[in-house]
């Protein structure tokens, strides 16, 4: 089933903040899992009970979220995974979507005018999905459980269905008009009149279950090199899309070095580019470190002003510098303490600064992510 809401499609962002538990630890270990849906949380708990570690639990919950929270998660999109091993090592796995090989700068222009809808709905809005590759890499390198087993467990939920609640329906109603554009999606998420299913309806997704089982039986190659990729190319041809079979074949999730900084006595670990979160969280905190925030009330105008200005400085840099480090130059200096001290001097405590142009960190053309 093809669903599309933006170029990002359905992003599953996984931030693993649990210690990965090695094999052989006592059975009374303390474990925790938190997700946005009870069934996904139960999937994580089940993974723990079967001897899995935090990576296994995260992947189990992510696969389940692909069933019960498809607005935000799913193997049709991408994800970032930040993992801390029990020995203290941090690993960042980049499973973000990539653009098709045929993508071009002007692909969303028509008669020289940008058409935003083309980047939000339809064949041109879709990137090469990376979540599945990231899950597979994480499980194979850092997990204890069999990926196929986790896929089959999530497939059971897709087959048996789950009850729609108010939260799901609020989001479903927002995309009804877009779902109606795609018959395969309409058949699943809308009734015969093209209206959303009511609260309490048991939503079953047999196609998704079948896909999960095919991946379990034939590995991720079924998705990236076999029938799924070929079927996607066929759909793209019929719907003026750009993705071809070779785009799936060439996709791979990547291990990257996390962004590390400190804020006063705390170490902060963030995700590197193509995510902007880690870089600019570090930048904002580094700027704020130059001010005595502890002497201010959190709701005071002074506190709010300083934090706002720090964020403005970071976001103007983000607009200019940030991108996929495989294709553009992203300076490491954005997250440096020295650069933050320079930016902090631009903050006027008595008025809003004019921040219209990005700043330039030291060695911006050579010290890169």
Language-model regions, residue ranges each:
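Extended, domain-scale alpha-helical bundle/helix-rich regions
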Residues: 277-279, 283, 313
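N-terminal secretory signal peptides that target proteins for export/translocation
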Residues: 1-5
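Bacterial N-terminal signal peptides
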Residues: 10-22
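Internal maturation/activation junctions in enzymes
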Residues: 291-369
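Noncatalytic scaffold domains of N-terminal-nucleophile
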Residues: 25-42, 46, 54-225, 229-272, ...
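Active-site proximal helix-loop segment of RNase H-like, two-metal nucleases, encompassing DDE(D)
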Residues: 285-291
């Amino acid at each position: 089933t093809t669903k599309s809401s933006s170029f990002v499609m359905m992003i599953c962002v996984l931030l693993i903040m649990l210690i990965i538990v090695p094999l052989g630890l006592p059975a009374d270990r303390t474990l925790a899992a938190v997700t946005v849906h009870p069934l996904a949380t139960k999937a994580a708990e089940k993974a723990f009970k079967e001897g899995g570690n935090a990576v296994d639990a995260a992947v189990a919950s992510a696969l389940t979220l692909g069933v019960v929270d498809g607005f935000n998660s799913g193997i049709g999109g991408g994800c970032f995974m930040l993992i801390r091993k029990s020995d203290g090592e941090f690993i960042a796995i980049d499973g973000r979507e990539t653009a098709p090989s045929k993508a071009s700068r002007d692909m969303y222009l028509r008669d020289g005018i940008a058409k935003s809808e083309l980047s939000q709905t339809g064949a041109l809005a879709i990137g090469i999905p990376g979540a599945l590759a990231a899950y597979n890499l994480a499980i194979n390198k850092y997990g204890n459980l069999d990926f196929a087993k986790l896929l089959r467990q999530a497939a059971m939920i897709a087959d048996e269905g789950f009850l729609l609640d108010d939260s799901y329906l609020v989001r479903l109603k927002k995309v009804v008009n877009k779902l109606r554009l795609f018959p395969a999606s309409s058949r699943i998420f809308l009734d015969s009149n093209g209206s959303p299913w009511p609260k309490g309806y048991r939503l079953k997704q047999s196609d998704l279950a079948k896909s999960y089982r095919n991946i379990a039986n034939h590995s991720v190659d079924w998705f990236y090199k076999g029938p799924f990729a070929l079927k996607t190319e066929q759909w793209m041809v019929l719907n003026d899309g750009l993705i071809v079979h070779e785009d799936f074949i060439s996709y791979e999730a990547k291990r990257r070095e996390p962004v590390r900084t400190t804020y006063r006595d705390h170490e902060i670990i963030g995700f590197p580019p193509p995510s902007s979160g880690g870089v600019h969280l570090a930048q904002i905190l580094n700027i704020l470190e130059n001010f005595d925030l502890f002497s201010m009330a959190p709701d005071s105008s002074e506190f709010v002003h300083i934090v706002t200005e720090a964020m403005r400085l970071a976001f103007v840099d983000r607009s200019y510098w940030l991108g996929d480090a495989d294709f553009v130059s992203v300076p490491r200096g954005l997250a440096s303490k020295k650069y933050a001290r320079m930016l902090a001097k631009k903050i006027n405590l008595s008025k809003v600064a004019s921040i219209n142009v990005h700043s330039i960190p030291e060695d911006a053309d050579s010290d890169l992510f």
